[in-house]
Amino acid sequence: MLLLRWKRFWFLSLGILLFSGVVSLMLFNLSESISFFYLPSDVARVVASNREIKVGGIIKAIKKSKDGVRFLLSDGAAEIEVLYEGILPSLVQDGINVVVVARFEGGLLLAKRVLVKHDERYYPPEDFIKSVRGE
């Protein structure tokens, strides 16, 4: 009888240990794949130089220059200037929500990618811009 209790105890303990190990591995892998983005008002206090981050906000004042495209990214509380060397997606214009993957250097975000934020519904480009602006 005592031997049966010890076997049951060790079997249950091993099961709990195995289950907690699997759950721990799942949570660890999930935490690596989740990607958050910062708001422009958070960038200055949380970002170290030369570290790649994601920053989300609303585009304001797009200007084309010889070194790329410059625009302001705003969250309503703060604005930060972004430099993107490349061709912007066709949906990018003033008032559109975007997420940029960039490095922060000297008060300027050097963008590697610009992603347009949208929901799961498909809109032709003209209708998308109208829906974002509330027309």
Swiss-Prot record:
Residue ranges crossing the lipid bilayer per the database entry: 9-29
Family annotation (Gene3D superfamilies): Nucleic acid-binding proteins (2.40.50.140)
CC terms in the record's Gene Ontology section: plasma membrane
Matches recorded under Pfam families: CcmE (PF03100)
GO molecular function: heme binding; metal ion binding
Residue intervals annotated with topology Cytoplasmic: 1-8
Periplasmic membrane side: 30-135
Localisation: Cell inner membrane
Keyword Oxidoreductase included in the entry's annotation: no
Topological type in the membrane: Single-pass type II membrane protein
Keyword annotations from UniProtKB, A to Z: Cell inner membrane, Cell membrane, Cytochrome c-type biogenesis, Heme, Iron, Membrane, Metal-binding, Signal-anchor, Transmembrane, Transmembrane helix
Family: Belongs to the CcmE/CycJ family.
Full protein name: Cytochrome c-type biogenesis protein CcmE
Provenance organism: Neorickettsia sennetsu (strain ATCC VR-367 / Miyayama) (Ehrlichia sennetsu)
